[in-house]
Amino acid sequence: MKKIFLAGLAAGFQTTWTLGKVIFPVTLLVTLLQHTPVMDWLVRLITPVMGLFGLSGEAAIPLVLGNMLNLYAGIAGILTLDLSVKEVFILAVMLSFCHNLIIESTVAAKVGIRIGVILAVRIGLAAVSAIVINLIWHGGKETAQYGFIAAKSAAPDSWLGMLAEALTKAGLGVLQLAAIVIPLMIIIQFLRDLGWLYRFSRWLSPFTQLLGMNKNTSMTMVTGLTIGLAYGAGVMIKAVEDDGVSKRDMTLAFIFLVACHAVVEDTLVFIPLGIPVWPLLLIRVTTAVLLTMAIAHTWKKWKPSAVGKEAI
């Protein structure tokens, strides 16, 4: 048990270090840019487009960071902005569906999934969900409170003050990251080394069949749901090869997982943003289930002779 704990602790610190190298400079840079004309110019340029999603122009900053880098970079961008609870929730939903596009799309390509399909699903889900939430939710107008980040005080009047503000926000962002990631990595290490991931795989078999996939897809699903697409890439690729998962089932699995993966981590990381995370999780799971079942049904209806025959 001690070895497992230490291995998980080491993985937690390693992950914190890796992601902290993104969180710290991104938070520092974006905070400093807020005091320059660059941010105002960018906001004016994209405000009309962001209005479709019920967001202010500056909300595009975390969207770009999250999609080009990762979810943590997007959250770092949010931490530097004064947004309403509704805006933060919409951003959280969009980023939960659509983040880390470069790396996670590459993972999809490695198991034979068309990158265009994955991008279309993720970007489409993010856009549609934002528009729907903006239309049906009329609350959440109060300013969001960001965990350790205190309410904004008077703007600093010197470059030294600006730098101090940026360093403080960047440091607190890394501390919040460590408080979430380290315990999470320890738990995942125990699950992996004690064989619980394989047990979850067996338990998940009926669910994968309900979604229209064969039960040999369950290990891939468990890995994606618990670890995520980026961190679980190696395990998922090996599971596809070892279990003989068909191209159809792999495509369906990835469609589900791009909408709902790393359900523990990608939900908990939003807690410091001061938004309700249970509705966020419910939206992800419900969307993933309904979308996957609909595509599986349509695929079976259009190509009944191909189901289960193609292998990667």
Curated annotation (Swiss-Prot):
GO terms for cellular component: plasma membrane. The keyword Cell membrane applies. It is a multi-pass membrane protein. Pfam families: Gate. It is found in: Cell membrane. It comes from the Bacteria. The keyword Mitochondrion does not apply. Coiled coil: none annotated. The chain crosses the membrane at residues 4-24, 45-65, 75-95, 117-137, 171-191, 217-237, 253-275, 280-299. InterPro entries: Gate_dom. Keywords: Cell membrane, Membrane, Transmembrane, Transmembrane helix. This is Uncharacterized membrane protein YvoD. It comes from Bacillus subtilis (strain 168). The gene is yvoD.
